[in-house]
Regions:
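A structural signal for multi-pass alpha-helical bundles of membrane permease subunits
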Residues: 6-8, 18-21, 25-299
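Short, intrinsically disordered terminal tails adjacent to the first/last structured region
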Residues: 1-12
Length: 299
């Protein structure tokens, strides 16, 4: 006849105290996360609400506008003036982002494949060197980059801006490398036995299997020029408003002489800039998350 041991009163008390402590920590953790979410969401909500305000300038007395209108969106999209050239800025940014998306994606995937799947002399040294370089912020090289572009007559040009974005993209290969490390070696070896070159293995075997990391790389490559202000401001410094990107144009609307007339339109522009990125994330969210998690697993 089997008997079941009954926990002593002391053990039961310890278990109860452990559950209470765990519950308290869980409540505190969720409260902290809720506070952080609130702090993060309030400026976004204010930007969105202000974009529908009938007031042209900043109104600190109200969080929710007294009256709502779509005029700010209509004005910034269909009525460009000497200050607000939003449709032109949007197209300039879109062109730079699309070109950089294609070039940077190719660079990142090729570098990641070479480091992950190819064995050559100096591979480890190159990998460690790239990781070390990534530890330093890109702004440290701004002056050198500017003078190089000036020497090549590429300042105030989209080609120079794209070159800067694409040229630095290859160093962000680590997540992609982690994903390529999970591709079975047997597949590549079988392809080599059939006479396939490294290029054919890369384009016909590895890339079709790498849709999550491909989406992740495409989104990141598109986001870099879409949200960048510092490099764009440094390179596109001619003062001609029609040559600006969205970030520079919207920043210009916050000048002291303009902010009381253009702030609500600035908010509308901020919302419009976020729409393409939001749609991109909603459509490709599944692949984006898969690319991060699978790439970080071994990377």
């Amino acid at each position: 006849m089997s008997t079941t041991a009954v926990p002593s009163a002391a053990v039961q008390k310890q278990l109860k105290q452990g559950k209470v402590k765990k519950g308290i920590f869980s409540v505190i953790r969720h409260l902290v996360l809720a506070l952080l979410a609130f702090i993060w969401l309030v400026p976004i909500a204010w930007l969105l609400l202000t974009s529908f305000s009938t007031d042209k300038g900043i109104n600190f007395t109200r969080f929710v506008p007294e009256n709502f209108t779509m005029w700010n969106y209509v004005s910034i999209m269909t009525q460009p003036d000497s200050v607000a050239q939003f449709p032109r800025w949007f197209m300039n940014t879109l062109v730079v982002a699309c070109f950089n998306c294609v070039i940077s994606t190719c660079f990142v995937l090729m570098v990641a494949y070479a480091i992950s799947c190819c064995r050559f002399k100096g591979r480890k040294l190159l990998q460690n060197l790239s990781v070390t370089v990534n530890l330093f912020p890109g702004v440290l090289a701004m002056i050198a980059v500017y003078f190089v572009l000036k020497y090549m007559n590429l300042t105030n040009s989209y080609a120079g801006l794209i070159m800067v974005y694409a040229g630095s993209s290859g160093l962000g290969y680590l997540i992609c490398k982690g994903f390529f490390d999970t591709v079975p070696v047997a597949l590549r070896e079988a392809a080599k036995l059939d006479g396939a070159s490294e290029a054919r293995i890369f384009f016909q075997i590895v890339i079709p299997m790498s849709r999550p990391i491909l989406v992740y790389t495409i989104i990141n490559s598109f986001l870099t020029p879409w949200t960048d202000f510092v490099m764009a401001k440094m390179i596109l410094n001619s003062g001609v408003s029609t040559d600006w990107t969205v970030a520079i144009g919207l920043y210009n609307m916050l000048q002291k002489a303009l902010i009381n007339s253009y702030f609500s339109r600035f908010c509308a522009g901020g919302v419009l800039v976020a729409i393409p990125i939001s749609i991109l994330f909603v459509i490709m969210q599944k692949f984006y998350v898969e690319g991060i998690t699978s790439g970080a697993a071994k990377g």
